[in-house]
Amino acid sequence: MRFEALDTRRLTGFLAEYVNQPDQCSDLFSYRWKTNGWEQERSEDLAKRSFSHRQALCRLLEARHAPLRKREACMDNIHKLKQENALVVVAGQQAGLMTGPLYTAYKAMSVILLAKQYEATLNQPVVPLFWIAGEDHDLDEVRYVHYLKGDMWKKLMLGDEPNGEAASTKVLPKKELDTFLAKLFASLPETSYTNTLKAMVTQAAATAGTYTEFFKLLMHELFYREGLLFLDSNDPELRAIERPFFKQLIRKVDALQECQAAGEARFVEKGYPSPIATEKQNAHLFYTLDGKRRRLDYEAGRFYVRETERQFTKEELLAEVDSHPQRFSNNVVTRPLMQEWLLPTLAFVAGPGELAYWATLKDVFALFDYKLTPIIPRLSATFVPCRVEKHLRERKEAAETYILGEGEKLKEAWLASQHSYPVAQRAQAAAEAIEAAHLPFRELAGEISPTLKKMGEKNRAFIQGQIAFLKERMEREIREQHQVGLSKYDEAMTWLHPKDAPQERILHSFILLNTAGIDIFSRLLEKKPPHTGAHLVFYV
């Protein structure tokens, strides 16, 4: 197994500037992640702050990790986090089925690698932690995976209907989940790893009650060796710990709205699209009412629960936080703030989309006397199966070409090199010759009568259609004669740029696990891939 890094000049969007020209956007951030010494600066900044809830948080983590099997490394990290100088490296994601797209696992790898790296650099304890966005209520974003049917990736949906309930409380429908898993494993090619994976998933499905629990159990099986900690952002006991900061968010809602709008405007002025694009009345909090998570708006001194008649004054909402903190949750603006208040966060690992909206939050953080958390781009990767790697070696081609979506060009160039039939040129010449010969004939028909003029046009279209038909049949025959070679290109595109998209956004982790083994992520971690922002290619 080996890996290579692609040229960062291939990056696009705001991520390209953040990686390749960080000075161009440094005013949007509090720390420069590519300069030496930022880790020490951040550590010293955090040392000046008090995390009085640290021990309560650690007790909660102990309680939530105690039921897990193979939990020893997790408990060691929780014990480490109890130390007053301990820091965390954080990433987060929704509770996707089968762990969701591969980039979720790459985020987990990132926090594990960086925690070890920074611990050595600072000579102080640093722990990897993964937020599970348990409060998320968009079920359609998490209840599907892609599976391979022929040479096409198809969606497989879990039969469960969204009802506005959060992922951490939405009960998994066991009968539908069993059907889903049976179809999923039937779609996977049988390997020496399949039965082990099936047993692992079946056990997790039998144990888990909710989407969040199922996600956590599977992720733990993949990363228990490294002691990766998990924190459900919708845990009711966590809400009680977070109560003081929810109050701050409510008290400062007016300024919060202004700072968020100003930060977004500054980002857009730099030529980038608005990453959040919300209305000015958005209070950047959610409130659960009648089992549904609903947005809170704030206008003219009052909070309004969207799509209901319910409203609160500030004092009434503060009292509600005191009585029922579990009814409140954050959005994309306030979740980073809550994380900064709750955790001694040395660094946050972000994907390209997260990086863009975090880049709008410096003013929002300053409102609470915080510096914007240091942001490190997550690992981004494509894995190359052995069979595809063999095809690439045979043709002396680079995986990068396919990863960048240029495989079709390679395929057509190869086909053109395999024959000397000038089909397109001859077809064009025939069409032009027929057009030249047919024109006076059509004109004569038109002179005779309008009816014959129309008939002449139809006759021309029919003849030209026959030329096009023969051309298409000739090209199809040539492709069929070279189908074995063409299928190798199709296979490479299917795996390296599925559905014309990055592999890490389409394929779920269990496709890689079934291909390379249940311990593949641990083996990749042993290779210590770098966090430079470059896209990595893993040959497994």
From Swiss-Prot:
The lineage of its organism: Bacteria, Bacillati, Bacillota, Bacilli, Bacillales. It holds the Pfam family CC_BshC. The keyword Ligase applies. Involved in bacillithiol (BSH) biosynthesis. May catalyze the last step of the pathway, the addition of cysteine to glucosamine malate (GlcN-Mal) to generate BSH. Its EC number is 6.-.-.-. It is an enzyme of class 6 (ligase). InterPro entries: Bacillithiol_biosynth_BshC (IPR011199), CC_BshC (IPR055399), Rossmann-like_BshC (IPR055398). Belongs to the BshC family. It comes from Shouchella clausii (strain KSM-K16). GO terms for molecular function: ligase activity. The gene is bshC. Keywords: Coiled coil, Ligase. Residues 457-477 form a coiled coil. This is Putative cysteine ligase BshC.
